Amino acid sequence: MNIRIGHGFDVHKFGGDSPLLLGGVNVPYETGLIAHSDGDVVLHAISDAVLGAVALGDIGKHFPDTDDDFKGADSRHLLRHCYQLAKDKGFVIGNLDVTIIAQVPKMAPHIQAIREVLSRDFATDLDNINVKATTTEKLGFTGRKEGIAVEAVILLAKA
């Protein structure tokens, strides 16, 4: 069986008046995240993990922030495109594990909704999707409530 592991990491700074989107879910908070696209840091980390697993670079290569075509882009669309590239190479998801690193907002009320969005976008069982959150105990930029970081690890298997 041919399997691949991909790791993704992304960070965005709080700011602006756009809604806070995390994992395709609108999370109530006083501000959104600054980004060229819609700023969904969760989906960006996952997209990088998918692309990394199949040796296709990163989202910056596929959707450069210098290209106005991607200004305000829907990150769910970007993720589905990345996953299609993996499927075109014969791979499907085995499982996904995501860690959201944020002091604010509290993520627990939103974890299940994020898992459900990801399950639909990957067309896989909910049991294959794990999302968790942690803080840095008020240390660093996330602890100072300046932004959010996300790590994602995905296992892809040859279909």
UniProtKB/Swiss-Prot annotation:
The region annotated as signal peptide is none
Q: InterPro entries this protein is in?
A: MECDP_synthase, MECDP_synthase_CS, MECDP_synthase_sf
- Keywords, A to Z? Isoprene biosynthesis, Lyase, Metal-binding
Its required cofactor(s), as named, are: a divalent metal cation
Q: Which domain of life is it from?
A: Bacteria
Q: Name one Pfam family in it.
A: YgbB
Full protein name = 2-C-methyl-D-erythritol 2,4-cyclodiphosphate synthase
Q: Which organism is it from?
A: Shewanella woodyi (strain ATCC 51908 / MS32)
Q: What is the lineage of its organism?
A: Bacteria, Pseudomonadati, Pseudomonadota, Gammaproteobacteria, Alteromonadales
